[in-house]
Amino acid sequence: MIFHASPGVIDLGVNIDHVATLRNARGTTYPDPIAAALLAEEAGADLITLHLREDRRHIKDADVRALRPQLRTRMNLECAVTQEMLDIACDIGPQDVCLVPERRQEVTTEGGLDVVGGFAKVQAACQQLAGAGIRVSLFIDPDPAQIEAAAATGAPVVELHTGRYAEATDDAEVKAELVRIERAVEEGIRWGLRVNAGHGLHYTNVQPIAAMAGIHELNIGHAIVAHAVFAGWQNAVREMKAIMVAARLSATTPAAAHPGVPA
């Protein structure tokens, strides 16, 4: 089986933000995130993810507009719940928009969206995007209250924040976070949601997450960009997709259990 060409097993969303970070570090026109996205598709990416931040620290408006008509898969645009970003998203029309929390001083997204605390605002954003024909995803912590609130907004998709799992430093903590994520997946499914996941996943920690049968899609960026320094961009994408699909397929064999998750 060609792992990087296995649709329907588990989807890989390649995040191109940090290709733009490299470009912007020198104020050049290279490396081109658009070219990176198209090459990622050729290497087996099922979608391209990019985050248009309010401060435009990596992806620029022009990147999103240039990329949208060129993609053969689909665009997953991450953005904050602000009127400016919602209007941009509705104008460009990506297939998916993932609403994320955003603070200017953070290095990367530090936690999930507080749907419970900002319910009315998030619900209104979901309605505006859905009205433009865009599928909405909410990037949330693997918490039952947040999942229930996400379902109540009308969003059809949640992306579970895997950062605490990725940052866990001992076996007990890793196992606890995997259990937390698996229960959140089950809760999301119970509410009729499509469940995705991402944040902090790399080549040696993605396997237990990819093995969880209820997860449809993983969005991974920094690890692939970093690995590409040594392995090459398309090889890095192919390797990640192969690891994910192998983990999922091995988990669906009769004798397999979810790695790291106690029964």
From Swiss-Prot:
Leading EC class: transferase
This protein's record includes keyword Cytoplasm: yes
Annotated pathway: Cofactor biosynthesis; pyridoxine 5'-phosphate biosynthesis; pyridoxine 5'-phosphate from D-erythrose 4-phosphate: step 5/5
The organism of origin for this protein: Ralstonia nicotianae (strain ATCC BAA-1114 / GMI1000)
Lineage summary: Bacteria, Pseudomonadati, Pseudomonadota, Betaproteobacteria, Burkholderiales
Classification via PANTHER family: PYRIDOXINE 5'-PHOSPHATE SYNTHASE (PTHR30456:SF0)
UniProt-annotated binding residues for 1-deoxy-D-xylulose 5-phosphate: 17-18, 53, 58, 108
GO biological process annotation, one example: pyridoxine biosynthetic process
Protein name, as recorded: Pyridoxine 5'-phosphate synthase
Binding annotation for 3-amino-2-oxopropyl phosphate: 15, 26, 200, 221-222
